[in-house]
Curated annotation (Swiss-Prot):
Residue ranges of the region described as Interaction with VP1 protein: 1021-1030
InterPro entries in alphabetical order: Birna_VP2 (IPR002662), Birna_VP3 (IPR002663), Birna_VP4_Prtase_dom (IPR025775), Viral_coat (IPR029053)
Keyword RNA-binding: no
Active site residues of this protein: S627, K670
Post-translational modifications reported in the UniProt record: Specific enzymatic cleavages yield mature proteins. The capsid assembly seems to be regulated by polyprotein processing. The protease VP4 cleaves itself off the polyprotein, thus releasing pre-VP2 and VP3 within the infected cell. During capsid assembly, the C-terminus of pre-VP2 is further processed by VP4, giving rise to VP2, the external capsid protein and three small peptides that all stay closely associated with the capsid.
UniProt keyword terms in alphabetical order: Capsid protein, Host cytoplasm, Hydrolase, Metal-binding, Protease, Serine protease, T=13 icosahedral capsid protein, Virion
GO MF terms held by the record: metal ion binding; serine-type peptidase activity; structural molecule activity
EC class: hydrolase
Function summary: Capsid protein VP2 self assembles to form an icosahedral capsid with a T=13 symmetry, about 70 nm in diameter, and consisting of 260 VP2 trimers. The capsid encapsulates the genomic dsRNA. VP2 is also involved in attachment and entry into the host cell.
Protein name: Structural polyprotein
Length: 1032
C-alpha cells in the first residue's frame, strides 16, 4: 500500500505534482501539465470581471469582461486559454487538477501607487443564472464562507483551486478537424455530451389583415462557448401567400446582441394560388458557430419569428410545432459550471492584471501524435479514492477553500501535505487534536486546520517532548468520576474524592486531601445569593503537568458580602480591574475598557454546583488571559435579571472590548470538555454558538436553562492521548454510570529533565500554559518569518526543534524589549504624544516594549475613540430626553443604540419608544426648491431663457435626491454648471460695434475764459519745466 496519496497531492498543489485519477476509467492516456499565462489590461472605469471555469476539461479556462460606465454594460475583452490548444493534438481528455492565481504588480505610466481590490466567489451554477455581477453584489451569490473571499488588495492576489465535484467522469471529445484528409476540413467541437433544451410551440388559427404580420419572440439561456443548433419540427398551415422570417440573436451576459452573430432565415410562398398551403417548420433550422467559436461567450439565444400576410385581404394561419436547442458539449461536466467570478474595482486604467496557473489533464492524443507518445492505462485505487472522498466531504472542518488569498494558499500548502500521509504516529495525532476524524478516515490521523494556526504553537510543539508529559500514558486527563449533578467532578487530579460523586453534597464528604501533589478539594461555598457562569480553561501547574487540566471548568461568581466572609484569603489573591470593579484570582494583561459591571467577581474551580452550593478549592490556580471575560458579563447579566444561586446550562469563552466579544484560542481543547459534558460553548470563535456582542449574549442567556440535577444522557465519545493507550474510542463521559471503570494509580507525571531544560533555558521559570500560549501568540503575530519556519518544521517532523525555537523566542521577549535604545524611545514618545493630541490613545506599555507603533494599534485606538464618542453622544441624548428616562436605564439605552449603525434621530427615538419599526427610512419631505441663489449668479438682468436653464439644473439635482436638496459636492457641481452656462451665453452673444464717445473740442474763446488761478498755475508749471509760455 502507498504511504502517501499522490492524487491528493496534485489536488492541493497542482504546480508541483501530477498523478492519475484513481477511479474506474481505464483508458490509455498521457498526463500533461498545461500552463495559463495572461496579462489583462483594465479599462477606463477601473472595474472588470474575470470568469473562471475551474473544472473545465477544455482549453477555454475563462474570459475577461470590462465594465463600460458610459453604456452600463459588460464589454467582452478576451478568452483565457491554456498555452496549448488541446484540440489540435488531442482527441479526448479530462481534468485532473488545477490552480489559477490572479494578481497585479505592474503600474501603468504616470501611476505611482497600486490601487484596487478583488472580490471572488465560487458557485455551483452557470453565469446566466446570476442577475447581478457588480463588484458590490458578487459575494452575495453564495453563503458558504469557504467559497468566497472579499476586499483583497490586487497586489496581494487570490488563488482559485480546482476541487473535484465527482469521480468516474467520462473523457470529453475535445474537438478536432475532421476528416483530416480534406483540404478544407470542417471544425467539429464536442460531438458528445450535448445539452438539449426545448418545448412545444403552438399558434391557434389567427387572422391577420392584408399586408399585416404576427410576431412571436422568446429566449432561452444556453451558456455556451461552442456550437449551438436550433431544430424545428411540425408545420404551419396558411391560407394564400405568406412570408416567414426567423431572426436568431445570440446574446451576451449584458443581454445585448453579440456583434456579427445574428442569423436570419426567410421562407415565402409568394406566387402560389389561393387556398390552403403548408410549410414544414424544419425550414427554420439553423446552426450557429460550428465553423468558428463565438466571438464572445453566449449567455442566451433570442428567437424572433415574423409571420407576414402578403395578400391585400384578411388571411389566416396556424402553427403546431416543437423546437429543440442543442448546445454542443453543454452537458460536459465542468464546461460551464461550477463558476468562479472574480470582480475587481478601483484599479488605474491600463493596470496589468496577471493571470498565471496550471491545469493537469489526462489526454488521449490523436493518431499522428500517438506514434511518438507512449501511453499508459489509468490507475484504479479504491483505497486512495475513498480516502479522498472522506477528505473532501470534511473540507469545512479541514479548512479546504476553493478560493483564497495567495498568502493563505501558500500557508495551506505547508501544512495540508499532512493530509496526504497515511502513516501518522498516534502520539503526533493526539497533539494535533485529530480524534474527531479518526473513525471516519481509515483510522488515519487527519489534522484540523484550525489547530495548525500559529496561535496554537505551544500545543503543536508538544508533539515531540511536552506531549509525553501533558498527554502521558498514565492518568492522561480522562475524567473518572460519575456525577449526576450535571457538572464535572474530581477529574484525575482529585481521585481520592471521586467516590462521593454520586451522593448528595455534604460537607462530611469533602475532607481535605493531604496529598501535596493536588489542589486541596476541601471547601463548599454558599453562593445562593451570587450570580455565576461557567468557562473552560487550559492550565499547567508549576513543575507538575496535571493531565486533566485541559478538561476543567471554572466559574465566575459575583462577590457578595457573605461570600467575602467565606474566603479569608481574598485580599491576598491577585486581581485586575474591569468595568469599574475587581476580578479576583486572575492575572490578565492588556485589559481594555469594558462595559460597566455591577459587582466584583472571583474565578474559582467548579467541582460541583448544586442548589446554591459550590464545591471548590481554597488554593485555586490563578487564571491568566482574557477568555474568561465573557463568562463574567454573562454572570453580570444574570445579576441584573435577579437570577441567583445557579448558572446557565452553558459555558462561555471570549474576551470583551467595549460591548464586542473577541475571538480566543484553544477552542478545540475547550470544546472537548463541553462536547463530552453535553453543554454548549458560547463565544465569537469559529465552531462555537455565536455571541458577537453583549446584546446578543443577553438574548442567548434567556434561551438557556440552568444547571440542575438530571438523569445523565450519553453524549459523543471523547478521546485524549492517554486514554488511547487503552481504547482510543472509549466513552469517557463523566455523566455515565460506569462504576467498574478502573482508576489509574498515577495521577500526575512530572516533566522530564529534557523537557525541563527546554523551558528553563536562560534561567527562566516555567510559566503556566495559558501564559505561554498568550506570550507565544503575541510574539508570532509580530514575527511572520517565525510562523513560516514553524510550518516548515512541522512538515519535517521536527517537533522538538519547534519547541526550542518558539518557546525560547517567546520567553526572551522582555530581553528584546530592553534593547530599545533611548533615542528610539524618545521618538516613540513623541509619536505617542502626537497621537494623543489627535485624540488617539494606544497602549503605551505595549508600544514601548515592542519598539514600534503598528497600523493595527492606531486603527484599534481610532475604533475605540469613535465608539467612546458615540457612547458620550448617546449619554447626552439620554440626559436630555425625559421620555427615554421613564422607560430605560442609561446603560440599556446606550447598549442598544451602540449596536446600530448610526446615531438615532428624534423621530427614530419616538418610534422606538412606541414599539414601531424605526428602521424603515422616513419618507422625504417636500422641500422648497431654492433657485434664487443660483439665478443671482447670472447677473442683475438675466434672460428668461437663462433662468429656465438654471431651474432645470436645480430640478435635476432635487429629483436625483428624491426631493432633498443638493449635497456639498452637488452644490459645487451646480455652481460650475451655472458658470459654464454663463460662459456659453457670452460666447454665443451677437457681437455689437463698440460705442466711441464723441470727441469734445474746446473753443479758443472757452480756453481764454479759464479762471485766472488756473492760468497762473499752468504758467508756473511750464516755467519749472523750462517750457515756453507761448504755445503755438
Amino acid at each position: 500500500m502507498n504511504t502517501t496519496n499522490e492524487y491528493l497531492k496534485t489536488l492541493l498543489n497542482p504546480a508541483q505534482f501530477i498523478s492519475d485519477i484513481p477511479d474506474d476509467i481505464m483508458i490509455r492516456h498521457v498526463n500533461s501539465a498545461q500552463t495559463i499565462t495572461y496579462n489583462l489590461k483594465s479599462g477606463a472605469s477601473g472595474t472588470g470581471l474575470i470568469v473562471v471555469y475551474p473544472n473545465t476539461p477544455s482549453s477555454i479556462s475563462g474570459f475577461h469582461y470590462i465594465w463600460d460606465s458610459a453604456t452600463s454594460n459588460w464589454v467582452f475583452d478576451q478568452y483565457i486559454y491554456t498555452a496549448q490548444e488541446l484540440k489540435d493534438s488531442y482527441d479526448y481528455g479530462r481534468l485532473i487538477s488545477g490552480s489559477l492565481s490572479i494578481k497585479s504588480s505592474t503600474l501603468p505610466a504616470g501611476v505611482y501607487a497600486l490601487n484596487g481590490t478583488f472580490n471572488a466567489v465560487w458557485f455551483q451554477g452557470t453565469l446566466s443564472e446570476v442577475s447581478d455581477y457588480s463588484y458590490d453584489r458578487i459575494l452575495s451569490i453564495t453563503s458558504n464562507p469557504l467559497d468566497k473571499v472579499g476586499n483583497v488588495l490586487v497586489g496581494d492576489g487570490i488563488e482559485v483551486l480546482s476541487l473535484p465535484q465527482g469521480f468516474n467522469n467520462p473523457y470529453v471529445r475535445l474537438g478536432d478537424k475532421s476528416p483530416s484528409t480534406l483540404s478544407s476540413p470542417t471544425h467539429i467541437t464536442n460531438t458528445s455530451q450535448n445539452l438539449a433544451t426545448g418545448g412545444a410551440y403552438m399558434i391557434p388559427v389567427t387572422t391577420v389583415p392584408g399586408q399585416g404580420f404576427h410576431n412571436k419572440e422568446f429566449s432561452i439561456n444556453v451558456d455556451s462557448v461552442g456550437p449551438v443548433d436550433i431544430l424545428w419540427s411540425g408545420q404551419m398551415t396558411m391560407q394564400d401567400e405568406w412570408t416567414v422570417t426567423a431572426n436568431y440573436q445570440p446574446l451576451n451576459i449584458s443581454g445585448t446582441l453579440i456583434a456579427n452573430s445574428q442569423r436570419t432565415l426567410t421562407w415565402s410562398n409568394t406566387g402560389v394560388s389561393n387556398g390552403s398551403h403548408y410549410m414544414n417548420m424544419n425550414n427554420l433550422n439553423v446552426s450557429l458557430f460550428h465553423e468558428n467559436p463565438p466571438p464572445e461567450p453566449v449567455a442566451a439565444i433570442k428567437i424572433n419569428i415574423n409571420y407576414g400576410n402578403n395578400t391585400n385581404g384578411d388571411s389566416s394561419f396556424s402553427v403546431d410545432s416543437s423546437f429543440t436547442i442543442n448546445v454542443i458539449g453543454g452537458a460536459t461536466i465542468g464546461v460551464n459550471s461550477p463558476t468562479v467570478g472574480v470582480g475587481y474595482q478601483g484599479v488605474a486604467e491600463g493596470t496589468a492584471i496577471t493571470i498565471s496557473g496550471i491545469n493537469n489533464y489526462e489526454l488521449v492524443p490523436n493518431p499522428d501524435l500517438q506514434k511518438n507518445l507512449p501511453m499508459t492505462y489509468g490507475t484504479c485505487d479504491p483505497h486512495d479514492l475513498t480516502y479522498i472522498k472522506y477528505i473532501l466531504s470534511n473540507r469545512e472542518q479541514l479548512g479546504l477553500r476553493s478560493v483564497m488569498t495567495l498568502a493563505d494558499y501558500n500557508r495551506m500548502k505547508m501544512y495540508m501535505h499532512v493530509l496526504t500521509n497515511y502513516h501518522v504516529d498516534e502520539r503526533e495525532a493526539s497533539s494535533f487534536d485529530f480524534w474527531q476524524l479518526l473513525k471516519q478516515i481509515k483510522n488515519v490521523a487527519v489534522p484540523l486546520a484550525a489547530t495548525l494556526a500559529p496561535q496554537f504553537a505551544p500545543i503543536i510543539g508538544a508533539a515531540d517532548g511536552l506531549a509525553n508529559a501533558i498527554l502521558g500514558d498514565s492518568a492522561s486527563g480522562r475524567p473518572v468520576g460519575n456525577s449526576a449533578s450535571g457538572m464535572p467532578i474530581s477529574m484525575s487530579r482529585r481521585l481520592r474524592n471521586a467516590y462521593s460523586a454520586d451522593s448528595p453534597l455534604g460537607e462530611e464528604h469533602w475532607l481535605p486531601n493531604e496529598n501535596e501533589n493536588f489542589n486541596k478539594f476541601d471547601i463548599i461555598y454558599d453562593v445562593s445569593h451570587s450570580s455565576m457562569a461557567l468557562f473552560p480553561v487550559i492550565m499547567m501547574e508549576h513543575d507538575k503537568v496535571i493531565p486533566s487540566d485541559p478538561e476543567e471548568l471554572y466559574i465566575a461568581v459575583s462577590l457578595t458580602e457573605s461570600l467575602r466572609k467565606q474566603i479569608p484569603n481574598l485580599n491576598d489573591m491577585p486581581y485586575y480591574e474591569m468595568g469599574g470593579h475587581r476580578v479576583y484570582n486572575s492575572v490578565s494583561s492588556n485589559v481594555r475598557s469594558g462595559n460597566f459591571l455591577r459587582s466584583d467577581y472571583i474565578l474559582l474551580p467548579c467541582y460541583q454546583l448544586l442548589e446554591g452550593r459550590l464545591a471548590s478549592s481554597t488554593s485555586p490556580n490563578k487564571v491568566t488571559g482574557t477568555s474568561h471575560q465573557l463568562a463574567i458579563y454573562a454572570a453580570d447579566d444574570l445579576l441584573k435579571s435577579g437570577v441567583l444561586g445557579k448558572a446557565p446550562f452553558a459555558a462561555f469563552t471570549g474576551s470583551v472590548v467595549g460591548s464586542s466579544v473577541g475571538e480566543v484560542f484553544g477552542i478545540n481543547l475547550k470544546l472537548q470538555l463541553t462536547d463530552s459534558l453535553g453543554i454548549p460553548l458560547l463565544g465569537n470563535s469559529p465552531g462555537l454558538v455565536q455571541v458577537k456582542t453583549l446584546t446578543s449574549l443577553d438574548k442567548k442567556i434567556k434561551d438557556m436553562g440552568d444547571v440542575k440535577r438530571r438523569t445523565p444522557k450519553q453524549t459523543l465519545p471523547h478521546w485524549t492521548a492517554g486514554s488511547a493507550s487503552m481504547n482510543p474510542f472509549m466513552n469517557t463521559n463523566p455523566f455515565l454510570e460506569e462504576l467498574d471503570q478502573p482508576i489509574p494509580s498515577n495521577a500526575a507525571k512530572p516533566i522530564s529533565e529534557e523537557t525541563r531544560d527546554l523551558f528553563l533555558s536562560d534561567g527562566q521559570t516555567i510559566p503556566s500554559s495559558q501564559e505561554k500560549i498568550a506570550t507565544i501568540h503575541e510574539y508570532l503575530l509580530e514575527h511572520k518569518e517565525l510562523e513560516e519556519a514553524m510550518f516548515s518544521l512541522i512538515s519535517q517532523g521536527r517537533g522538538r526543534s519547534l519547541i526550542n525555537m518558539v518557546v525560547k523566542s517567546a520567553l526572551n521577549i522582555e530581553t528584546q524589549s530592553r534593547e530599545v535604545t533611548g533615542e528610539r524611545r524618545q521618538r516613540l514618545e513623541r509619536k505617542l504624544r502626537n497621537l494623543e493630541n489627535q485624540g488617539i490613545y494606544v497602549d503605551e506599555s505595549k508600544i514601548m516594549s515592542r519598539g514600534r507603533i503598528s497600523k493595527e494599534d492606531t486603527e484599534l485606538a481610532m475604533r475605540i475613540a469613535r465608539k467612546n464618542q458615540k457612547d458620550a453622544k448617546l449619554r447626552r441624548i439620554y440626559s436630555n430626553n425625559a421620555s427615554i428616562q421613564e422607560s430605560y436605564t442609561v446603560d440599556d439605552f446606550v447598549s442598544y443604540w451602540m449596536e446600530q449603525e448610526s446615531l438615532p434621530t428624534g423621530i427614530q427615538i419616538a418610534m422606538w419608544l412606541k414599539g414601531d419599526d424605526w428602521s424603515q427610512p422616513i419618507p422625504p419631505r417636500v422641500q422648497r426648491r431654492h433657485y434664487d441663489s443660483y439665478i443671482m449668479m447670472l447677473g442683475p438682468s438675466p434672460t428668461q431663457e437663462q433662468a429656465d436653464a438654471v431651474k432645470d439644473l436645480v430640478d435635476d439635482i432635487y429629483d436625483r435626491n428624491q426631493g432633498k436638496g443638493p449635497s456639498q459636492e452637488q452644490a459645487r457641481e451646480l455652481s460650475h454648471a451655472v458658470r459654464r452656462l454663463i460662459s456659453h451665453s457670452l460666447v454665443n452673444q451677437p457681437a455689437t460695434a463698440p460705442r466711441v464717445p464723441p470727441r469734445r473740442i474746446v473753443s479758443a474763446q472757452t480756453a481764454q475764459t479759464d479762471p485766472p488761478g488756473r492760468r497762473a498755475a499752468l504758467d508756473r508749471l511750464r516755467r519749472v519745466r523750462g517750457e515756453d509760455n507761448d504755445i503755438v
